[in-house]
Amino acid sequence: MASALADAMTSSGRDLVVLDHGGWRRHPWAEVHQRAENIAARITEDAATVVVLVGEPTVEFIAAIPGTLYAGAALSILPGPVRGADLGQWARNTMQRCASIGVRLVFSHGEHLDALRATPASIPTCDVTETGHARRDSSFTPPDHGEFAVLQGTAGSTGIPRTAQLSPEAVLANLRGLVACIDITPADTGCSWLPLYHDMGLAFLLTNALGGAELWQAPTTAFSASPFSWLQWMTESTATLTAAPNMAYGLIGKYGSRLTDFDLGALRFALNGGEPVDCQGYRRFATEMARFGLDPSALVPAYGLAESSCAVTVPILGSGLQVDEVQVSSDDGRFIRTHAVVGEPIPGMQVRIAPTDGSGEQVDGRDFGEIEVRGTSLMSGYLGEPPLEAGSWFPTGDLGYFVDSGLVVCGRAKELITVAGRNIFPAEVERVAAQVQGVREGAVVAVGTDESAVRPGLVIAAEFRGTDEPAARTELVQRVASECGVVPSNVVFLEPGALPRTSSGKLRRLEVKRSMEDVNR
């Protein structure tokens, strides 16, 4: 894997373009490679076998990714502090996390570096900027690669976060599969603000590097501060490739009618992954962006997971958003569920649907079950747990089914809501609830409470910033009852930012469920 990246970067005539201190700065991939070798030399000198990166995506920070791989060490990228967090406590927690996964060297920069160095931890912590610019007396000779290339944290949205151990062969197979499916060439330009500690952000960066494309990389904090800047970045870069979670497309689509003066005519690949795809919101994004030249065939709803290095399925290039509609019966009539088709397995991967113990539904001829995967991109196992057997099927915990055009993912098995014997996927309720004025986009959780609760059934918790809670609550109940065929037993409005999330921004539905059950006992 290291040699493949080195060859791609040294032979590329394109650039890495980084948003740094408010301005875009160009760095040829060959320069990034040179800085990566400087960092690799330091890792080799320290004989570090596991390296952690923490910080904003500067050119040196990004160079440390291939640099770690060049040194044959295992890479783990950890998130910085969330807004409003205590910096000292974050630093202590981060160093404890480093110790738990066997880290031997930490690279960071700026205030993050200062905070990490102020902890009592004994793990060496280096300035990635200084190391990237260090002069070497001799050329770097890469050692043999280690057993693992990446230690990727899982989201932990339905349980305790774990660490997936990914071999160099698995990561490279996934990257090559993506390059083939997307047909990345040096003529392409990628644009991303995804966090590099998330598997989707890391894979997007590395696929562009491996494919010889130009990449414009912005910090996630820059998107969070000004989401519509994403459109400006794609316009400035003449981006052909981008990727984002569903909430970003939903946000842009919701307020798209207010926007002017963008050019998305070059965009041919806009991947939607990392969370359930809201077909209505994704379509609205395409409709609103059409006047800026967006071709709807660029929409790419995909499926992946950290345990499979990143991607599992991707639709055929240019097919756009394809949906499957399922008619569901309830006591109040028949309702239609709409799910995105997330395509076929990438090269080297296989997917099957395994029967479940009553957690799926047999509707309209679809065989619902748990999605299981295996293949060349699959992890070796979780850190601290027994390794996976070679060639074994890995149960993802996701429910879905197949149609002629590919896989359909319905939701997490642990998050399935059962009301009066009927199974409901949280995403369909959350999509409807988010349409109520004052309810924050991407800040709604639907859960089911058990029979021991005072008000068992469907409970909706939503961050609310409107002025008329009673009217909004009434509208929400009516909308959900009309469109989903179930009446919520309770609706709870919360302050913005109150819902618990993972480090990658995913809502922790099971934590909300426990809180709602505790309150209602």
Swiss-Prot record:
Domain of life, per lineage: Bacteria
Entry similarity comment: Belongs to the ATP-dependent AMP-binding enzyme family.
Function per UniProt: Activates lipidic moieties required for mycobactin biosynthesis. Converts medium- to long-chain aliphatic fatty acids into acyl adenylate, which is further transferred on to the phosphopantetheine arm of the carrier protein MbtL.
Class of enzymatic activity (EC top level): ligase
InterPro entries the record matches: AMP-bd_C_sf (IPR045851), AMP-binding_CS (IPR020845), AMP-dep_synth/lig_dom (IPR000873), ANL_N_sf (IPR042099), FAAL/FAAC (IPR040097)
GO biological process assignments: fatty acid biosynthetic process
Organism: Mycobacterium sp. (strain MCS)
Pfam families membership: AMP-binding (PF00501)
Record GO cellular component, one term: plasma membrane
Xref: Gene3D superfamilies: 3.30.300.30, N-terminal domain of ligase-like (3.40.50.12780)
GO terms assigned for molecular function: adenylyltransferase activity; ATP binding; long-chain fatty acid [acyl-carrier-protein] ligase activity
Name listed for the protein in its UniProt record: Medium/long-chain-fatty-acid--[acyl-carrier-protein] ligase MbtM
Record-listed E.C. numbers: 6.2.1.20, 6.2.1.47
Keywords: ATP-binding, Ligase, Nucleotide-binding
Pathway(s) annotated for this protein in UniProt: Siderophore biosynthesis; mycobactin biosynthesis
The reaction(s) this protein catalyses: a long-chain fatty acid + holo-[ACP] + ATP = a long-chain fatty acyl-[ACP] + AMP + diphosphate; a medium-chain fatty acid + holo-[ACP] + ATP = a medium-chain fatty acyl-[ACP] + AMP + diphosphate
